[in-house]
């Protein structure tokens, strides 16, 4: 069993200690993340570089988040590929080519800016953190990136990491479709990956 982490925040690695105790997977991640998240594991490979396992190539993409060694990933197998990109305030343009025309995207669309700014439950400092370069992609940020990346080989987009208070699935999908339409990009196979359970199993 293989585990590859994106970063060390508790909401992303909080269950690893329990999972590891039962299944003893090999954890492929940076040692700094093991330390930051206080993970009680000894079977890990301290690596944050490109990795090949069987016929799958795993390419880490540095993200901009307030966590040590945060990463998104590109998974390649033959002519098929998946992008997993969440928990980042922006994406460095030097990775645009690597992220373009992939088969499937799992892509952060965290918040609607207006809902976030008008949310009385979020203090000002937290709003600024979310909106900052080390925060999260808004619906509009996400849509503009995806409009650059979606290509003729793209089959599916899952919008992910939606805020329960500052977003909703209909709004995130609508924002993406509007921007794709403005840019004359014909693509509508879009779903939201919810926090309530797994998505359906799909073949790419």
Predicted stretch roles:
Residues 1-2:
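Short, small-residue-biased leader/transition segments that mark boundaries at the very start
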Residues 93-192:
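Cap/insert and terminal regions of metallo-dependent hydrolase folds
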Residues 188-204:
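Short, basic/aromatic-enriched C-terminal tail that caps enzymatic domains
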Residues 8, 32, 63-66, 86-90, ...:
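Active-site metal-binding loops of divalent metal-dependent hydrolases
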